[in-house]
Design a protein with these regions (language model features):
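Walker A/P-loop
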Residues: 33-52, 64
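Conserved RecA-like helicase motor-core motifs
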Residues: 82-92, 193-199, 236-238
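Conserved strand-helix element at the start of the C-terminal RecA-like helicase core
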Residues: 61-71, 230-241
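Conserved helix/coil segment N-terminal to the catalytic DExD/H
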Residues: 44-47, 92-135, 143-149
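Conserved Walker A/P-loop ATP-binding site and its immediately adjacent core
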Residues: 59-81, 90-92, 96, 115-118, ...
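Conserved pre-motif I regulatory segment
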Residues: 1-41
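Pre-Walker A (Motif I) flank of P-loop NTPase domains
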Residues: 32-38, 59-60, 108-110, 169, ...
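Post-DEXD/H (motif II) to motif III coupling segment of the RecA-like Helicase ATP-binding lobe
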Residues: 129-135, 142-199, 218-220
Length: 241
């Protein structure tokens, strides 16, 4: 697909006026069947990478996501844009979960969102395997890091899960991954010659400064002055002290 074609797909399906830095190369690599690790800051459009790549690749996509609320938000956003998607987690009725897998196997569902713990269930894994997914997405991939505060033990099984699924291309996404964490993600997931896309985390809209005050009244006045200056007029704000 040409750049203009990809831009058109993004615009027509999701209303994106243009792709952000790092998105196109990650989408192209995943759509070409290559493993990808994309490290982009929050708000940089990680979800768009797997959504657009999956729409280019024929066949269903299994998205591993650690939070039910996140799964629900992603499903709602996809459905709102006319894309067939469902979640199959512990808060979904058993009959609806079965229907979701039936739809995935029948080719009537583009995206199925599951938690890593569910894929430890042999029955769930068997159903996912029967769907022959063409792409496996691992969201919040830093959860695989064994020494991180977000560590989820079931993420360690995802490399084996990918093999059981027929080893589709793996697209791993995270906003939090220093070089050692990236290396662990690649190793634990068994990524093969992955494209690693890392984009800057500079936030020009965020300003950090330190000022020292020995007088409490002066400190309070400074906080009020800075708050009023930042607000640019009457409004509501939060001060962490």
């Amino acid at each position: 697909m040409t750049t203009s074609g990809l831009q058109r797909l993004a615009r027509q399906t999701f209303g994106f006026q243009q792709l952000r830095p790092g998105q196109e190369e990650a989408i192209r690599a995943a759509a070409a069947g290559r493993d990808v690790l994309a490290v982009l800051p929050t708000g940089a459009g990680k979800s768009a990478i797997y959504q657009l790549a999956a729409l280019i690749i024929p066949g269903p996509t299994v998205v591993v996501s650690p939070l039910i609320a996140l799964q629900r938000d992603q499903v709602a956003a996809l459905v709102a844009n006319g894309v067939d998607a469902a979640e199959a987690n512990s808060q979904v009725r058993a009959a609806d979960r079965r229907q979701a897998f039936d739809d995935l196997i029948a080719g009537d569902l583009e995206f199925l969102f599951v938690a890593p713990e569910q894929l430890a269930n042999p029955e769930v894994l068997e159903q996912a395997t029967a769907a022959k997914p063409s792409l496996m997405v691992v969201d919040e991939a830093h959860c695989i890091c064994s020494w991180g505060h977000d560590f989820r033990p079931d993420y360690l099984r995802l490399g084996a899960v990918a093999e059981a699924l027929g080893r589709p291309p793996i697209l791993a996404l995270t906003a939090t991954a220093a070089p050692p964490v990236r290396a662990e993600i690649v190793e634990r997931l068994g990524l093969r010659d992955p494209l690693v896309v890392v984009r800057g985390f500079d936030r020009p809209n965020i300003h950090l400064a330190v000022e020292r005050f020995t007088d409490g009244d002066a400190k309070r006045r400074a906080v009020l002055d800075r708050t009023a200056e930042a607000a640019g007029g009457p409004g509501v704000g939060i001060v962490y002290a």
